[in-house]
């Protein structure tokens, strides 16, 4: 199983859940996105496209095989390309004696002096520990992958919020993001799924809601009691 910023996102969204990454890693069937999720996806693509349109000439790396995109990313960074769209990074980390591949595809790399700014578009209006810690971890992981690829840290990690405000995320060398990946990897490596209580608000928008609620009802889970969430 590859790890990526999306792995961290799955742990936090649509709500924090220890079970969701395990289900994804083990190929559990997931419901198709509902109308609301589809609208969010369209808005996200439009937000990204609008920012892309305002950047001027950009090397578009969104096409090609995964291996080709990785190689092209390295090549263009070495050449000092002014801006890259959908670059691909890959590295490995060691978790419990095993090498695990880590991949990441930030939206943009923007040339800044001798290095680059890593920039990603989000619909969220905030990016902080209290409201969207997963955004911080994702950007930190992109920064770590960039440093492993380019041999130097990014000059900045930036989020383009849903209102087009650009917010900078402090770079800690990737420590917190890697710690999050270690935790998730150890959970997904379990033979049996971890327990995570269902909740009306917690499970809204999750593709595994039907599965988890059916199992909770089957075992008479206390989390089904009214007022327990």
What is each stretch, according to the model?
Residues 1-5, 186-197:
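Short, intrinsically disordered, charge-biased short linear motifs at domain edges
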